[in-house]
Amino acid sequence: MDVCVFVMTCKDLADVLARLFRRGVKIRIITDKEQLQASGSQIWALMKEGIPIRTNDSSYLMHHKFAIVDGNVLINGSFNWTRQAITGNQENLIITEDKNITQLFMREFQKLWEQYDPNKVADRET
């Protein structure tokens, strides 16, 4: 499962990811660097679980909000992974198994995963 979200403060969603990871599901997460410090951020807990996490290295926002499940299902929309998004906000979320669309998002995730590789960031700074 590849997760690319701007912010993740919903403990329930983070707990689901942690349980899946403990059961052997491969999970990778990309999130916005500044959101690591957001109040209630669950990213640190997921890092402690051992889930690979990468963040952007730019002053610009990594503002995507999508997840790809088993390389077949795309979940995409305005939905931040927060309690407020679940319980109060006006949000949109589309779930599709359209292979053409899902492949586009898989390529975008992989591009960002490679771009945000901490080793490559270190190389650019030297």
Tell what function each PLM region has.
Residues 42, 62-63, 90:
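Residues that flank catalytic or metal-binding motifs in active/ligand-binding sites
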Residues 73-126:
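Signature of lipid phosphatidyltransferase scaffolds
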Residues 6, 66, 105:
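Short, structured motif recognition centered on aromatic/hydrophobic residues
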Residues 54-56:
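General small-molecule cofactor/ligand-binding pocket signal
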Residues 46-47, 60, 67-70, 87:
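Extracellular/periplasmic catalytic domains that process cell-envelope and extracellular macromolecules
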Residues 1-52:
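Primarily the HKD phosphodiesterase
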Residues 65-68, 94:
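Short beta-strand scaffold segments in enzyme catalytic cores
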Residues 7-11, 33-37, 59-61, 73-74, ...:
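Solvent-exposed loop/turn segments at secondary-structure junctions
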